[in-house]
Amino acid sequence: MRKCLAAVLILTVCVFPAMTSFAWNAAGHELVDLIAYQQLTPAARLAVGELLRQHPRYEKDLLANKPEDVDAGLWAFLIAGTWPDVVRSQAHPMMQTENHSVWHYVDYPFNLGTAEGPVPEEEWVPGTDPKNLLQAMTKIQADLNDAAVKDYDKAIRLCWLEHLIGDLHQPLHTSALFSDRFPQGDRGGNSQIVQPKNGKPVNLHFYWDSAVTTDATLPAVAKLAAELTADPELSREALKDELSHGAVKDWVMESYAVCKSIVYRDGTLPSSVAPATRGVIPNGVPPLPEGYEADAAKTARRRIVLAGYRLADQINAIYK
């Protein structure tokens, strides 16, 4: 594994194109996808490479800015994992048909005091558009295993599979806090402003998006992926209990538990309420508690690695 990732690092001296990210930042999604790609079987790697070539935006999006010395299959796979964020742009020609904003999250309520948020609908009804991440994953898995679905549609679904497995391992994509301060919910941390030890105040969701790294250059991503997968505490053996749970709902509930206990600190996390005016930062934002940032970094690294292993397992199972 370490040699494979090092080879990627040696071959590449370029950066990924800049992208807007809405879950893990671009680097986080690339970490998930690179860890997964290195664990694909030869048959699965060949299959996904052929499938992604059927993507209607293969040349214009998935191979955009690909340097000559980087394998097209690897590059397309990594960019595919960020494509559901790319297609959110109003300027993208497929925005109207392939942008599904509600697919990126499923907010199970974390209720404090008398506040009570709605419980999301878990079951997807075939023939309907999924209402949340959990329903979207059911549809995506069904489509990828359905011989009647056209390859170009499956290629788009593969992009979503990569992306949503990354998303659901970001704890704030599985929960929203409801309390006297947030009677309508904190929108997965977007309504809370926190103050890191170093840097400017940011909303809680953005803080967790960037908890692993903000460097999205491929050499940096490859180096960090090698570091993470070489960590004995993040090996498949060390994570075997979590990896024994193969159901997407289990993964979501795992993230939800992490969100309650570590992200929200069981409801004790100090923060300020985000003003209604976008981009305005309130005065006097309380600092994050001692040890919070170290806990966040350690937790986020673990979530990234689990997502990578699980994505590989999903794809290997489909393309045996």
Indicate residue ranges for each PLM-predicted region.
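Positively charged n-region of N-terminal signal peptides that target proteins for export
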Residues: M1-C4
